[in-house]
Amino acid sequence: MGTVNINSSINNNIIENNTNNVKNNSNALDLQKNFLSLLMAQMKNQDPTDPIKNSELTSQLAQINTATGIERLNSTVGIFSNKINQSQNIQVSSLIGHHVMIPSSQIVHTKGIETKYGIELISDATAVNIQITDKNGKIIHIQKIKNLKSGIHSLTWDGQNLDKEDMKTEKYNVTVIAKNQNREIPVQVLSEALVNSIITSSSIDPIIDLGTVGTVTLSKIRKILK
């Protein structure tokens, strides 16, 4: 009858367990490295108006192998949360000098220059009626458009009133009524503005300085113009 070497058996079990632990740790590290590489690529190509959120990052990280432990996971989340904020701030800063569309029923007109603005339709419209009025409520411009699809549409006002006179530099009000057949549909007026500067913070949505238009948060930007 053969004999069993207990010490050898124990040593073999220890070696096997250590090998499995190394493999598991290696797999966990590989998963993390792959995840982090994909995350960095996603951050570089993300939409600055809809950046990846810390909560999304945490959810994705929680699904990878946890062999490295919760403490290490939390540390990783903290590090990459900071990287996300830094990357977002860099991308948002690139908006400086660009024109954007934001929700506003007021447009800022400069005399002698065409004024761009827009509307956002929730659904298709068969008829859109637009009126621009001055601060006294006097109608100075009327425009009628047929058959517009849902989405954002850029429009232009030549800056003249109904008598073809150039209007002075100031703010004007825009009223829009959109209908699909006889049913009125929701519509949002959009004002164009130039991004002058950005105020960033790790705890709040970046603040966009639009000069005479005022300030808005990044999430309010509906369209970035070239």
Swiss-Prot record:
Keyword Nucleotide-binding annotated: no
InterPro entries (UniProt xref): FlgD, FlgD/Vpr_Ig-like, FLgD_Tudor
Keyword line: Bacterial flagellum biogenesis
Highest taxon in the source lineage: Bacteria
Gene that encodes it: flgD
An example Gene Ontology biological process: bacterial-type flagellum organization
Function: Required for flagellar hook formation. May act as a scaffolding protein.
Name the record gives this protein: Basal-body rod modification protein FlgD
Species of the source: Buchnera aphidicola subsp. Schizaphis graminum (strain Sg)
Keyword Phosphoprotein part of the UniProt annotation: no
The family this protein is said to belong to: Belongs to the FlgD family.
